[in-house]
């Protein structure tokens, strides 16, 4: 994993106005990059039309390689990332429960109980380039999200397709 000058993080890992107990990146806050350094958010850029945050600027502490500070300071959050120089766009399909109730067979029409959010398709996801290597296998863990299987029949070399097969426990929902 190569840390370069431009990284991608999950949108949920940054907040311009964080709530209490938010242990991820925010203006003036320091977090640990998983397998990397401590970084501190110095500024961010928003899209003038939508207000959406499109860039987060940070400084890093070169003395914290490996995620530990020689001065003993601690950070409360660790976020994962992917280097912009070492990633590709992918389509990711997230599956949820098919029905909105536990026993759909007890209803007159089970079709009324289908969960409209049982499939979420996420396009333009960033994944490491290793997924393009045919010798790397077809099953991957995407940190904090779960285990995914590469769809070699419906995906493409340019934009691989992944299906989530198992979720991980959501420790962020506490």
Model-identified regions with their sequence ranges:
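Short, small-residue-biased leader/transition segments that mark boundaries at the very start
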Residues: 1-3
């Amino acid at each position: 994993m190569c840390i370069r000058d431009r990284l991608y993080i999950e949108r949920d890992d940054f907040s311009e106005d964080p709530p209490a107990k938010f242990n991820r990146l925010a203006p003036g806050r320091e977090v640990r990059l998983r397998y990397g350094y401590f970084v501190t958010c110095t500024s961010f850029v928003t899209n003038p039309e939508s207000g959406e945050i499109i860039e987060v600027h940070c400084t890093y502490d070169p003395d914290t390689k490996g995620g530990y500070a020689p001065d003993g300071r601690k950070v409360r959050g660790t976020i994962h990332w992917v280097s912009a120089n070492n990633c590709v766009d992918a389509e990711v399909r997230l599956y949820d429960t098919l029905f909105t109730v536990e026993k759909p067979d007890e209803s007159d029409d089970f079709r009324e109980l289908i969960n409209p959010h049982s499939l979420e398709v996420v396009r333009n996801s960033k994944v490491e380039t290793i997924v393009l290597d045919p010798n790397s296998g077809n099953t991957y863990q995407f940190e904090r999200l779960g285990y995914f299987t590469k769809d070699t029949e419906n995906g493409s070399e340019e934009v691989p397709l992944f299906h989530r097969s198992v979720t991980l426990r959501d420790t962020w929902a506490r």
